[in-house]
Amino acid sequence: MDSGMRATCTVPEHFLPRKLSKQNLDRFIPNRSAKDFDFANYALTQGSKRNLDEVTSASRKAYMTQLAVVMNQNRTRILAFRNKPKSLLSTNHSDSPHQNPKPVKPRRYIPQNSERVLDAPGLRDDFSLNLLDWGSANVLAIALGDTVYLWDASSGSTSELVTIDEDKGPVTSINWTQDGLDLAVGLDNSEVQLWDCVSNRQVRTLRGGHESRVGSLAWDNHILTTGGMDGKIVNNDVRIRSSIVETYLGHTEEVCGLKWSESGNKQASGGNDNVVHIWDRSLASSKQTRQWLHRFEEHTAAVRALAWCPFQASLLATGGGVGDGKIKFWNTHTGACLNSVETGSQVCSLLWSQSERELLSSHGFTQNQLTLWKYPSMSKMAELNGHTSRVLFMAQSPNGCTVASAAGDENLRLWNVFGEPPKTTKKAASKKYPELFSHVNSLR
């Protein structure tokens, strides 16, 4: 290297090795844990570049300087010869209600197989009948041909309640009182028998309300509502001898579904005329031509599936038969249809969960399945298969967890579909009318 080159390549003095003295026998060793190599790399490679579009006003420079102070404190040196500053005290976010996210509820396990299968020989495959009911005393009643059987879910024992004479039968409908002690039995000859299931004795026969078979029954305390093939709906006060107190006229074909609301203020009926009616007892005895509160004609097939919502008193779910296959939701205050969901098959029965916002539907051809829906999104949570024929009947246990389903394949299946019961489960209703039939002197 010539002398000219040496003149232009002077070595900075602070890079030359320092002479050691007797008083300074060691070097300063930087604390590597306090180094900021990322910032150093940026400063060496990008720090000197300038953006040609950068605003160079005084306020902009002041802002950038202040931002650098806030974001990059004590970064004037690349090598740090001191320890890191102490970390900030940890903040307990549990003291602030706005910081705590709600705990995520674990996804509930839904068994895909039935817990138990019972034979039900002679079960009639008729869409217009109602042959299964689970009482509040935890006894399941099922009608097989001319005979009504009782299955005690607590003990597992089965007993025969009654076999109807051939000239009166077969049995076309059954329904428990709210206390689970008495059972109404509708017959093909238009009569309704009332049975005390504690003593296994018949206490009364209701006649004169219908001209043909009684396929639907629904209790509201001492009022037994009956629906017949003649299209009539009759309210019977079982405490008095002349039991018929109101008659509703509106259906032109057989009444195949009846349900009282939880409050007992409204009653829903569905028929083979594809019509759903909402009835109010105050209108039944009026002289007006129209007795119903609302009339829904949107279904295109028979409506048997009816279910009042347990958490919203005015909400009613209905399901259409073959050719319709829709579940519809109604506001029974206004008469508005809130939603309509296509299921793809005949809707035979509907049940609400007592503890969750869920709805269970049973179906016919092609899959003959039970479908669990999340309300109000109506997204499918599970499909339960096992039946080989349309699932006409469903009944819910008193604690709300177990569902019994009966189909034309003559099988009765038990499903743990609704999970564990709520912490405050409802106790079996006490009998409001312990002397319900005390004023009746004759059984027939």
Swiss-Prot record:
Assembly behavior: The APC/C is composed of at least 11 subunits that stay tightly associated throughout the cell cycle.
Source taxon at top rank: Eukaryota
Protein name: Cell division cycle 20.4, cofactor of APC complex
A Pfam family recorded for this sequence: WD40_CDC20-Fz
Compartment annotation: Cytoplasm
Stretches with biased composition (Polar residues): 88-99
Family indicated by similarity: Belongs to the WD repeat CDC20/Fizzy family.
Keywords from the UniProt entry: Cell cycle, Cell division, Cytoplasm, Mitosis, Repeat, Ubl conjugation pathway, WD repeat
Keyword Chloroplast attributed: no
GO BP terms, alphabetized: cell division; protein ubiquitination
Segments annotated as WD repeats: 124-161, 166-205, 209-246, 250-289, 298-340, 342-383, 386-425
GO CC term (a single one): cytoplasm
Region of interest (Disordered), ranges: 88-108
GO MF annotation: an example: ubiquitin-protein transferase activator activity
Disulfide bonds: none
Physiological role: Component of the anaphase promoting complex/cyclosome (APC/C), a cell cycle-regulated E3 ubiquitin-protein ligase complex that controls progression through mitosis and the G1 phase of the cell cycle.
Pathway: Protein modification; protein ubiquitination
